[in-house]
């Protein structure tokens, strides 16, 4: 999600960073995420494309797939998604239950990226926006590791699903 901006943060927070600063950074990130989510919704979001939905169904729960919305591109003003897409290597960014993709092609065809970002949606469901932001500031590598692992497992599962095999 925000790995493209991870160069600005340590992979794991160092003990020399005061806990109060980490708390402040977590609060600031949560505000940026919520603001970007609201802006994306105001700009217009869509349900998961039907072909992508069908491919994800069976690995991800239907309730999750029905809830998630997506859009393409960042906002026009200075924002977290704009920074992630312009100055980082982010292909997508997850803002609660809204996924912003850098371009339409990624949204239409990159199922592994969808699996990665849906994992972040599930993390938001477990932790809330503030909890997600706090964890991301303190251990972005750990947050991303779960999403990468899920995406890898999904990619391995996808070719087998038609044969009746399941995990």
Question: PLM features: what roles do these ranges have?
Answer:
Residues 118-134:
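Catalytic Zn2+-binding segment of zinc metalloproteases
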Residues 43-93, 98, 153-161, 167:
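Auxiliary, metal-adjacent structural segments of Zn-dependent hydrolase domains
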